[in-house]
Amino acid sequence: MKQTLRIAILSAFACAALAAFSNFAQAQKVDFAFGLSTLEAPAANSTGPSLTGGTYPGFSGDVLFWHNFGIGGEIYWRATQSNYASIYGTIPYRPLFLDFDGIYEPKLASHTYLELSAGIGAMDTRQYCSECGNGYNTNYTSDKHFMGDFGAGLKFYPKGGFFIRPEAKVYLVTNNQLFSSSYATRFGASIGYTFGRH
Protein backbone atom coordinates (compact mmCIF):
# COMPACT_ATOMS: atom_id res chain seq x y z
CA MET A 1 0.00 0.00 0.00
CA LYS A 2 1.41 3.38 -0.96
CA GLN A 3 2.25 5.88 1.78
CA THR A 4 -0.45 8.35 0.73
CA LEU A 5 -3.12 5.66 0.99
CA ARG A 6 -1.82 4.69 4.43
CA ILE A 7 -1.96 8.32 5.53
CA ALA A 8 -5.56 8.67 4.25
CA ILE A 9 -6.65 5.51 6.09
CA LEU A 10 -4.85 6.54 9.26
CA SER A 11 -6.37 10.03 9.12
CA ALA A 12 -9.91 8.69 8.69
CA PHE A 13 -9.57 6.35 11.63
CA ALA A 14 -7.71 8.90 13.75
CA CYS A 15 -10.66 11.29 13.36
CA ALA A 16 -13.14 8.56 14.23
CA ALA A 17 -11.02 7.40 17.18
CA LEU A 18 -10.57 10.94 18.48
CA ALA A 19 -14.31 11.57 18.33
CA ALA A 20 -15.01 8.18 19.88
CA PHE A 21 -12.59 8.35 22.77
CA SER A 22 -13.15 12.02 23.62
CA ASN A 23 -16.86 11.31 24.14
CA PHE A 24 -16.75 7.57 24.84
CA ALA A 25 -18.74 7.90 28.06
CA GLN A 26 -21.57 9.58 26.15
CA ALA A 27 -21.43 7.36 23.07
CA GLN A 28 -24.05 4.66 22.68
CA LYS A 29 -21.80 2.58 20.44
CA VAL A 30 -18.70 2.59 18.26
CA ASP A 31 -18.33 0.43 15.10
CA PHE A 32 -15.28 -0.57 13.04
CA ALA A 33 -15.58 -2.63 9.84
CA PHE A 34 -13.77 -3.99 6.80
CA GLY A 35 -15.65 -4.44 3.52
CA LEU A 36 -15.45 -5.57 -0.09
CA SER A 37 -17.50 -3.89 -2.81
CA THR A 38 -17.84 -3.26 -6.52
CA LEU A 39 -18.99 -0.20 -8.47
CA GLU A 40 -21.80 0.23 -10.96
CA ALA A 41 -21.80 3.34 -13.17
CA PRO A 42 -23.18 4.41 -16.57
CA ALA A 43 -21.54 2.76 -19.60
CA ALA A 44 -18.48 4.23 -21.28
CA ASN A 45 -19.19 6.97 -23.82
CA SER A 46 -17.36 9.72 -25.70
CA THR A 47 -16.69 11.50 -22.39
CA GLY A 48 -14.64 8.65 -20.94
CA PRO A 49 -14.61 5.12 -19.56
CA SER A 50 -17.05 3.80 -17.00
CA LEU A 51 -16.14 3.30 -13.34
CA THR A 52 -18.10 0.01 -13.40
CA GLY A 53 -16.45 -3.11 -12.04
CA GLY A 54 -13.42 -3.96 -9.99
CA THR A 55 -13.06 -4.99 -6.37
CA TYR A 56 -12.99 -2.21 -3.79
CA PRO A 57 -11.70 -3.13 -0.32
CA GLY A 58 -12.23 -0.57 2.41
CA PHE A 59 -12.48 0.38 6.06
CA SER A 60 -15.23 2.23 7.90
CA GLY A 61 -15.99 3.43 11.39
CA ASP A 62 -18.75 5.31 13.16
CA VAL A 63 -19.80 6.62 16.56
CA LEU A 64 -23.43 7.00 17.67
CA PHE A 65 -23.85 9.75 20.27
CA TRP A 66 -27.49 10.66 20.68
CA HIS A 67 -30.31 8.18 20.35
CA ASN A 68 -29.60 6.58 16.96
CA PHE A 69 -27.65 9.50 15.44
CA GLY A 70 -23.89 9.78 14.96
CA ILE A 71 -20.97 10.40 12.64
CA GLY A 72 -18.80 8.10 10.56
CA GLY A 73 -16.14 7.87 7.92
CA GLU A 74 -14.93 5.41 5.33
CA ILE A 75 -12.32 4.87 2.66
CA TYR A 76 -12.65 2.49 -0.31
CA TRP A 77 -10.16 2.05 -3.16
CA ARG A 78 -9.93 -0.12 -6.26
CA ALA A 79 -7.77 -3.16 -5.45
CA THR A 80 -6.21 -3.38 -8.92
CA GLN A 81 -5.41 -0.78 -11.52
CA SER A 82 -7.70 -0.36 -14.51
CA ASN A 83 -6.77 1.17 -17.87
CA TYR A 84 -7.85 4.54 -19.23
CA ALA A 85 -7.53 4.97 -23.02
CA SER A 86 -6.35 8.47 -23.86
CA ILE A 87 -4.84 10.24 -26.87
CA TYR A 88 -1.44 9.55 -25.24
CA GLY A 89 -2.05 5.81 -25.02
CA THR A 90 -3.29 3.59 -22.22
CA ILE A 91 -2.91 5.02 -18.71
CA PRO A 92 -3.37 2.78 -15.64
CA TYR A 93 -5.55 4.36 -12.94
CA ARG A 94 -7.01 3.58 -9.51
CA PRO A 95 -9.98 5.47 -7.94
CA LEU A 96 -10.18 6.05 -4.18
CA PHE A 97 -13.32 7.24 -2.32
CA LEU A 98 -13.02 8.96 1.08
CA ASP A 99 -16.05 10.37 2.90
CA PHE A 100 -17.38 11.56 6.26
CA ASP A 101 -21.06 11.03 7.00
CA GLY A 102 -23.93 11.66 9.33
CA ILE A 103 -25.43 8.31 10.44
CA TYR A 104 -28.94 7.30 11.51
CA GLU A 105 -29.26 3.71 12.76
CA PRO A 106 -32.71 2.62 14.01
CA LYS A 107 -33.34 -0.89 15.31
CA LEU A 108 -35.62 -2.93 13.02
CA ALA A 109 -35.79 -6.23 14.91
CA SER A 110 -33.77 -8.28 17.37
CA HIS A 111 -30.11 -8.14 16.25
CA THR A 112 -31.03 -6.18 13.09
CA TYR A 113 -30.46 -2.46 12.39
CA LEU A 114 -31.01 -0.20 9.40
CA GLU A 115 -28.07 2.12 8.72
CA LEU A 116 -28.70 5.30 6.72
CA SER A 117 -25.86 7.69 5.89
CA ALA A 118 -25.25 10.91 3.97
CA GLY A 119 -22.19 13.10 3.79
CA ILE A 120 -19.35 14.66 1.85
CA GLY A 121 -15.91 13.58 0.78
CA ALA A 122 -13.59 13.27 -2.20
CA MET A 123 -12.86 10.97 -5.11
CA ASP A 124 -9.14 10.70 -5.81
CA THR A 125 -8.21 9.18 -9.19
CA ARG A 126 -4.57 8.15 -9.32
CA GLN A 127 -3.06 7.86 -12.79
CA TYR A 128 0.15 5.82 -12.91
CA CYS A 129 3.11 6.48 -15.21
CA SER A 130 6.89 6.34 -14.98
CA GLU A 131 7.36 10.04 -15.77
CA CYS A 132 4.75 11.46 -13.39
CA GLY A 133 4.56 12.00 -9.66
CA ASN A 134 5.52 14.70 -7.24
CA GLY A 135 9.25 14.04 -6.83
CA TYR A 136 8.81 12.06 -3.60
CA ASN A 137 9.19 8.57 -5.11
CA THR A 138 5.58 8.34 -6.28
CA ASN A 139 4.75 7.06 -9.73
CA TYR A 140 1.30 8.64 -10.10
CA THR A 141 -0.53 11.91 -10.44
CA SER A 142 -3.65 12.54 -8.43
CA ASP A 143 -6.92 14.06 -9.66
CA LYS A 144 -9.21 14.94 -6.71
CA HIS A 145 -12.88 15.92 -6.88
CA PHE A 146 -15.37 16.94 -4.18
CA MET A 147 -18.33 14.57 -3.81
CA GLY A 148 -21.54 14.07 -1.90
CA ASP A 149 -22.80 10.63 -0.98
CA PHE A 150 -25.73 8.79 0.55
CA GLY A 151 -26.32 5.15 1.29
CA ALA A 152 -28.01 2.42 3.29
CA GLY A 153 -27.14 -0.90 4.84
CA LEU A 154 -28.67 -3.64 6.98
CA LYS A 155 -26.60 -4.58 9.99
CA PHE A 156 -27.06 -8.15 11.32
CA TYR A 157 -25.51 -9.29 14.63
CA PRO A 158 -25.11 -13.11 14.50
CA LYS A 159 -23.00 -13.31 17.70
CA GLY A 160 -22.15 -10.71 20.32
CA GLY A 161 -20.74 -7.48 18.89
CA PHE A 162 -19.79 -9.00 15.51
CA PHE A 163 -21.89 -7.82 12.59
CA ILE A 164 -22.39 -8.39 8.86
CA ARG A 165 -23.62 -5.42 6.81
CA PRO A 166 -24.79 -5.65 3.17
CA GLU A 167 -24.71 -2.07 1.89
CA ALA A 168 -25.09 0.29 -1.05
CA LYS A 169 -23.82 3.84 -1.45
CA VAL A 170 -24.28 6.43 -4.22
CA TYR A 171 -21.40 8.82 -4.93
CA LEU A 172 -22.15 12.17 -6.65
CA VAL A 173 -18.80 13.51 -7.89
CA THR A 174 -18.38 17.10 -9.11
CA ASN A 175 -16.51 17.78 -12.37
CA ASN A 176 -15.72 14.10 -12.90
CA GLN A 177 -14.71 14.66 -16.53
CA LEU A 178 -12.32 11.70 -16.73
CA PHE A 179 -15.20 9.21 -16.64
CA SER A 180 -18.56 8.62 -18.33
CA SER A 181 -20.64 9.99 -15.46
CA SER A 182 -20.57 12.12 -12.34
CA TYR A 183 -22.14 9.37 -10.24
CA ALA A 184 -21.42 5.77 -9.29
CA THR A 185 -23.08 3.26 -6.96
CA ARG A 186 -21.06 0.99 -4.68
CA PHE A 187 -22.57 -2.40 -3.71
CA GLY A 188 -20.91 -4.64 -1.16
CA ALA A 189 -20.77 -6.10 2.32
CA SER A 190 -18.76 -5.41 5.46
CA ILE A 191 -17.90 -7.37 8.57
CA GLY A 192 -17.11 -5.57 11.78
CA TYR A 193 -17.42 -5.22 15.51
CA THR A 194 -19.53 -2.94 17.71
CA PHE A 195 -18.27 -1.63 21.05
CA GLY A 196 -21.16 -0.67 23.31
CA ARG A 197 -24.81 -1.62 23.28
CA HIS A 198 -26.57 -3.02 20.23
List where the protein language model places each region.
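Cleavable N-terminal export/targeting peptides
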Residues: M1-K29, G196-H198
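Transmembrane beta-strand segments of Gram-negative outer membrane beta-barrel proteins
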Residues: Q26-P42
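Gram-negative (and chloroplast) outer-membrane scaffold detector with strong preference
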Residues: D31, S60-N134, H145-G148, F156-R165, ...
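Surface-exposed strand-loop-strand hairpins of Gram-negative outer-membrane beta-barrel proteins
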Residues: S37-G58, D143-K144
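Extracellular loop and loop/strand-boundary signature of outer-membrane beta-barrel proteins
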Residues: A44-G48, N83-I91, G133-Y140, T174-F179
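Catalytic Tyr-X3-Lys helix of short-chain dehydrogenase/reductase
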Residues: G153
